[in-house]
Amino acid sequence: MHDQIAKYTQKLLRDRTAVPDSIHFYRLDDVVSTNRQDEWLAMFTEVFQGLDITALLFARLTLPFADLLVDREEPGTHRLVPKDSETKVFLHDIPFIRKKEWEGASKTDLTTMIVRCLKERKAAIIQGLGVVSTGGVTVEQAYIGFSTIFHTTFVKYLLDVLTDGFKLPNERMVFEGFKLAWNRTPDLSGLVFTPGPLERTAASHLSPRPNPLPQEPREIIYKEICQVGRYTVEKGFVDSFFGNISYFDGTTIYISQTTSSLDELEGFIDPVPIDGSSTAGLSASSELPTHRGIYLDSPYRAVLHGHPRFSIILSMLCDEKNCGIKDCNRLCNRTRTVCGVPIVAGETGAGGMAKSVPAAIKEQGVCIVYGHGIFAAGEKDFRKAFMKMAEVENRCREEYFRLSEERTGSK
């Protein structure tokens, strides 16, 4: 488990989600131990005793949005209820402990508060101290919970600023500092993409082209999927490492497996016949039906799906008043766009998204799913798909800060 702790510590630093000197992993072997000796070990040992877990992460977020959201909540509330897709899938809601509740309390009382929160949810916010996230079986699960809280509080806070403005003293100053640090275009220089069609590159020495491709030529497709998956994580276009990616060679969809890490796809790519003639798709991404629908309805060969945050925020910004639809991510039937890109509703997996995305993506090769993320496609290879995703997220980031200035007067 020591190797896993080192691995996920590095991922937190890469993601810019946790303050470096605040990262504390705790693990249960015969006894609870930690990656660094600290004053919290005794308390979290008691937390382990109250829960059925093997790992726990305690760290401060690099952005203050979680604490600000707690302060913006009405007195008496103890949960944040974001509406983005990742929260609904992984957390449902986020319990929190207000600073005034734990400040001055004994560590025994704080332990009781933490256990109460974590018996119901995988992670919780302790205002002024940090986020605590659990792993029932693995360190990775604790990392995912922490990363999801960073993602969802980022999305919820910035969306709330657009809709409700600033509510707290010094909130505008904090926002301006965030804007200076984050309103910049990611550096995409140095990214290398294999020109497509990849199956032609892979089988260029074979005539006639066999079906399916033999193992060695397939490796070019696998290698490119792995590389582009890493790019997607490294450039911050996902939360933690979730998303999915696929390539279609005319008969077979090569797609990342469900719950796989986009930055570690080696050995986790499934070849799935598009006609459904095998059971290979059983471990494939839950969004395989959406990828299949795109390939059946368009000339695209490469599809990339990520969760860029500013695109998600603007997809959820709606000025419709007195709308009777509450479950917008599933039921909204309005035709909406942001920065010229269509926004669609639909559940993941075999739900409405498998119908809405293929139709929406057909013309431009890109669309945004409400509260969820971007689907981008390329006709021959992943270069266009990746660059479309980056371009849309950049435009949404610029539009977000334009709207924030317009609505709040921020400069």
What kind of region is each of these model predictions?
Residues 1-411:
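Glycine-rich flexible loops
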